[in-house]
């Protein structure tokens, strides 16, 4: 049972990165009241030095100084996933070994912890599968009622997992954006906490622990390149936060380049990058088509401007992968003992054939193959 007496740490305020509007801590507001855009957190922590981490909890909560919430009670031991070499200079972080089998647990535990403090009547979320599963699991752990909105065509295995945790599943006709729109409408009801992995900045402050772990795994340094799959950009933006925190604290002397990977079938950000655009607003993007990488099939990500800026500021770039590259990468990883879902192999698909040159890199393997099965041959 959650220990509410431990929840006395003041919450930082949120603000809109577009117009600066501030949203006080402790409210159920999920977006900017003026522009309806996503929020950021007014929080600039200082990470602990490497040697001070010895003996701490073997989970992402070992980086307590960098997290906006303290005294976790909903934890399932998330974080501290293995880092294994795939080939010389390129390693993989096995985030598919999280409690719900995807990296989304990093952010979901922060959202559940926040919801406990705000004490809503209900929690709603939207997802193509993995975020919904993670939020359902952590809401179950926190004993919070939860409804997850998913688009039609979501993997049956992911739907089963969401339901198994006791969440109500609402399948919405249409694509990923249709599911998000339905969840946002529900989120406007009084007493509702919108556990959005896109709009709520607490999620990003959970995903940033991915890079804090890399830094610790690599003995206080980072690779030349951090390769990240991008749909809504939550892992990439979390990575950018962590890099900034480590650099500001003097714990790294150079920032790695962020390489953002999209499916060629749904690649609005890669198109904007190629056009030199700073946002998707007013930009004619190519039509989308079905993709095996359903988890990053986001035609209009709300944080597009932030994603493009983060990649540009890091000296990184965008890469796209074809459906055949995804199939081949999934089988290649399976032949090495790593069974990863089709979305989760996108980064390996992007770099396995030499896109990095001699630079060192880490790719995340974001979701377990059991969630989708092996992609069928073309």
Annotate each predicted stretch with a short phrase.
Residues 4-378:
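PLP-dependent amino-acid enzyme catalytic core
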């Amino acid at each position: 049972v959650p220990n509410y007496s431990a929840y006395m740490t003041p919450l930082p305020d949120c603000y809109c990165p577009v117009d600066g509007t501030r949203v006080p801590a402790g409210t159920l507001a999920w977006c900017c009241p003026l522009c309806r855009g996503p929020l950021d957190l007014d929080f600039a922590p200082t990470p602990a030095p490497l040697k001070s981490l010895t003996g701490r909890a073997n989970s992402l909560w070992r980086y307590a100084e960098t997290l906006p919430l303290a005294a976790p009670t909903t934890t399932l031991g998330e974080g501290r996933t293995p880092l294994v070499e795939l080939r010389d200079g390129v390693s993989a972080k096995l985030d598919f070994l999280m409690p719900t089998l995807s990296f989304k647990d990093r952010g979901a535990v922060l959202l559940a912890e926040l919801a406990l403090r705000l004490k809503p009547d209900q929690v709603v979320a939207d997802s193509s599968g993995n975020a919904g599963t993670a939020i359902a699991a952590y809401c179950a752990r926190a004993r919070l009622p939860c409804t997850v909105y998913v688009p039609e065509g979501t993997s049956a295995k992911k739907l089963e997992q969401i339901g198994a945790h006791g969440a109500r599943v609402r399948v919405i006709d249409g694509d990923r954006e249709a599911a998000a729109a339905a969840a946002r409408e529900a989120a406007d009801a009084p007493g509702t906490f919108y556990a959005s992995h896109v709009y709520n900045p607490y999620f990003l402050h959970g995903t940033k622990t991915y890079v804090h772990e890399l830094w610790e795994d690599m003995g206080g340094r980072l690779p030349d390149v951090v390769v990240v799959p991008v749909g809504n950009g939550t892992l990439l933006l979390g990575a950018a936060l962590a890099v900034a925190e480590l650099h500001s604290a003097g714990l790294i002397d150079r920032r790695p380049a962020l390489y953002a990977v999209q499916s060629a079938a749904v690649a609005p950000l890669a198109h904007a990058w190629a056009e030199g655009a700073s946002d998707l607003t007013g930009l004619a993007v190519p039509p989308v088509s079905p993709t095996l990488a359903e988890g990053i099939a986001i035609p209009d990500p709300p944080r597009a401007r932030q994603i493009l800026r983060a990649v540009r500021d890091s000296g990184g770039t965008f890469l796209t992968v074809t459906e055949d590259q995804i199939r081949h990468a999934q089988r290649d990883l399976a032949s090495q003992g790593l069974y990863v879902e089709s979305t989760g192999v996108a980064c390996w698909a992007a770099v396995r054939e030499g896109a990095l040159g001699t630079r060192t890199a880490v790719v995340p393997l974001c979701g377990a193959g059991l969630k989708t099965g092996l992609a069928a041959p073309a």
